[in-house]
């Protein structure tokens, strides 16, 4: 079985890693839209257009299912993708919500994400339907920190404190509502202390067990729309080793 995964950049590699750890034999094609990262500051129409282009690229590679490893794209484009792309499409939001509701003891749940994801209200609506009190916060500097490899240290600590100080003592569970954010999990957990941190990439990989046939050849192709200088560093940081990368060629508008 061949799985297509796309994200606005390298953050979706956390989803790829979670899927590969659980399903060892699947073939995976990954597309990171590094030329247009971040999606979280774009308009709804632009996010949908970018998502359709990425999904179309993966479909042309012959994938059997598509995983939208970007929370912003999941929030704005998932329903459109399901209508227009003739393969099953899965997003990261619903699995993350289910996991948070299961883990939370007092149903006081925080959500952090890009400005677009938080503005969409996608997490908030689903959590409130589950009876949770929701505290949502956009953390726009987290994606650039992750993309630059600044995963810990003084700068990252100060940015984490700046965004999350209002959560301290108010929540018992936090959803990392962006696939870049697990890269900063160490500093986030250190600052928040005794709070359950939900990684949507892990929740998503678990939710796919009814749809994935673990019967491929374990092949992996990594495509990116821009081969940035720190790309190999980030791939090795997330996946644990170097992998060859290819420049994605196709209809990628700006």
Curated annotation (Swiss-Prot):
Q: Name one Pfam family in it.
A: Asp_Glu_race
The positions annotated for binding substrate are 7-8, 39-40, 71-72, 147, 179-180
Q: Which Gene3D superfamilies match?
A: 3.40.50.1860
**Catalysis performed (reactions):** L-glutamate = D-glutamate
Would the keyword Membrane be found if you checked this record's keyword annotation? no
Query: What InterPro entries does UniProt report for this protein, alphabetically?
Result: Asp/Glu/hydantoin_racemase, Asp/Glu_race, Asp/Glu_racemase_AS_1, Asp/Glu_racemase_AS_2, Glu_race
Q: In which pathway does it act?
A: Cell wall biogenesis; peptidoglycan biosynthesis
Source organism of this protein record: Aquifex pyrophilus
Leader sequence range is none
Summary of temperature dependence: Thermostable.
The residues responsible for catalysis, as annotated, are 70, 178
Biological processes annotated in GO: cell wall organization; peptidoglycan biosynthetic process; regulation of cell shape
Q: What does this protein do?
A: Provides the (R)-glutamate required for cell wall biosynthesis. Converts L- or D-glutamate to D- or L-glutamate, respectively, but not other amino acids such as alanine, aspartate, and glutamine.
How is this protein organized at the quaternary level?
A: Homodimer.
The UniProt similarity line reads: Belongs to the aspartate/glutamate racemases family.
EC number(s) given by UniProt:
5.1.1.3
Q: What is this protein called?
A: Glutamate racemase
**Keywords in UniProt for this one?**
Cell shape, Cell wall biogenesis/degradation, Isomerase, Peptidoglycan synthesis
GO MF annotations in UniProt: glutamate racemase activity
């Amino acid at each position: 079985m061949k799985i297509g995964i796309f994200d606005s950049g390298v953050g979706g590699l956390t989803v790829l890693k979670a899927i590969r750890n659980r399903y060892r034999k699947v073939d995976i094609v990954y597309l990171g839209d590094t030329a247009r990262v971040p999606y979280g500051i774009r308009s709804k129409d632009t996010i949908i257009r970018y998502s359709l282009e990425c999904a179309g690229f993966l479909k042309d590679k012959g994938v059997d299912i598509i995983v939208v490893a970007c929370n912003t794209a999941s929030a704005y484009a998932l329903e459109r993708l399901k209508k227009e792309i003739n393969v099953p499409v899965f997003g990261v939001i619903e699995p993350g919500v289910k996991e948070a509701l299961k883990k939370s003891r007092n149903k006081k749940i925080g959500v952090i994400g890009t400005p677009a994801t938080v503005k969409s209200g996608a997490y908030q609506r689903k959590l409130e339907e589950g009876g949770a009190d929701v505290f949502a916060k956009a953390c726009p500097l987290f994606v650039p920190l992750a993309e630059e490899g600044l995963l810990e240290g003084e700068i990252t600590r100060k940015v984490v404190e700046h965004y999350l100080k209002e959560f301290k003592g108010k929540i018992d569970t936090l959803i990392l509502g962006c696939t870049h954010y697990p890269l900063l999990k160490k500093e986030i957990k250190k600052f928040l202390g005794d709070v359950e941190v939900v990684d949507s990439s892990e929740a998503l990989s678990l939710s796919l067990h009814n749809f994935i046939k673990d019967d491929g050849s374990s092949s992996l192709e990594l495509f990116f729309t821009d081969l940035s200088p720190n790309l190999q560093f980030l791939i090795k940081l997330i996946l644990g080793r170097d992998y060859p990368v290819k420049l994605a060629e196709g209809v990628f508008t700006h």
